[in-house]
Amino acid sequence: MRYFPINLDLRGKPVVIVGGGAVAARKCLALLAAGARVTVIAPTLASPVNEVAENGVLIHLARKYSKGDLAGASLAFAATDNRTINRAVANEARLNGIPADIVDAPELGNFTSPAVISRGDLLITVSTGGESPALARKVRMELEKRYGPEYAVLIKILGKVREKLLTEKANSPYNKKILNQLVEQDLAELLKKSSVAEIDNLLRKLCGPGFSLAELGIGEKDKE
């Protein structure tokens, strides 16, 4: 295994993307969703990133990359169709100790971006180490079918239950038993069916009074 998997907290961190095509756009949107401060360097931007740039959510430098553009960056991405530019980005990143993902030549960078399935706080990633993005996409699509939008609500419910249990009864073996039992239940299927009464009954049966969806603060908006 060449790469070590890691989740980075990029909230408020400066990230530079060199390139404005479809690949760069996907990375840009994912980084913005993670709270990064994104600068994109490219003569033009693909949709929908061009609309995002017009709203001032990111910085767009409408030109080609120049040496020194990575100054102050926490991460860098090279996603152009010009290998010379991508290699120049890789060189600048390496000389300045900036982690870089070089899309067309992962061996020049020191990390790669996996295919991602995001269901709220449930994050599933698939990586082939840059060997086969096509296979990573295929596996991602299979996982997307297996883990639908209901899992975003499920993880929220589990988090609320855990928080309430820890607050009321501390981190006891009893709590761990309840949480383990809860994840073995078919809550995801009940969420797909919007079976609120059944979910409430199950939560109260396992966790006791005060653990209905409403009492946990899970409303209709969360279930959309």
Show which residues each predicted segment covers.
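ADP-ribose/adenylate-binding Rossmann-like module
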Residues: 75-81, 86-112
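Hydrophobic, well-ordered beta-alpha structural blocks that scaffold small-molecule cofactor pockets
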Residues: 1-44, 49-53
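Hydrophobic beta-strand scaffold residues
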Residues: 38, 60, 97-100
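Glycine-rich, highly charged phosphate/nucleotide-binding loops
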Residues: 53-71
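Short loop/edge segments at beta-strand edges and connector loops
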Residues: 42, 60-64, 104
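Residue-level detector of alpha-helix initiation sites
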Residues: 21-23, 84, 130
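E1/E1-like adenylate-forming module used to activate ubiquitin-like modifiers
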Residues: 102-152
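An accessory alpha-helical subdomain
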Residues: 130-224
